[in-house]
Amino acid sequence: KRTFEPEDIGPNIQLHMNRCILCYRCVMVADQITDNRVHGVMDRGDHSNISTCISHAIDNEFSGNMIDVCPVGALTDKTFRFKSRVWFNKPYDAHRDCPTCSGKTTVWMFGDEIQRVTGRKDEFHEVEEFICNGCRFDHKELADWTIEGPRAFDKDSVINQNNYTRKLDKVEIATEDHI
């Protein structure tokens, strides 16, 4: 089992290397949308890990987009950690006039409070447009956003149903088939 010590990579992003599958998506996104590369894959083989160069913090204007492209949750939003479960929040498409990015986002709300802000994703769950850190981390007030409407999800999505009360038609356990 691979275990890693926690590493602080910035004021807004938490890295959990124990979850990382070394897909390099965060490294590629940071390299493509920013001018300076401050993190990458360190060491070789079984000792490989994602880290910043000489323990510098990742502080560029679009660094939060690495959270959206991480497929396993190894990079998480420090401003949203342990606030609530994702399936308790309702996603809404929203936008704002931002001089740095497009401002088109999905805001995740619990009641009237914005819990987190993410980039909009298409039907393949890929980020449509990257958003700046100002939109993602700094603007958590409802007055900062123009709400366009609720976000559409697949009919069987836990987030769309927002509960676990739907009864199953039939439950079959075929233990003899697996013995």
What do these predicted regions represent?
Residues 1-179:
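N-terminal export/assembly segments and adjacent metallocofactor-ligating motifs
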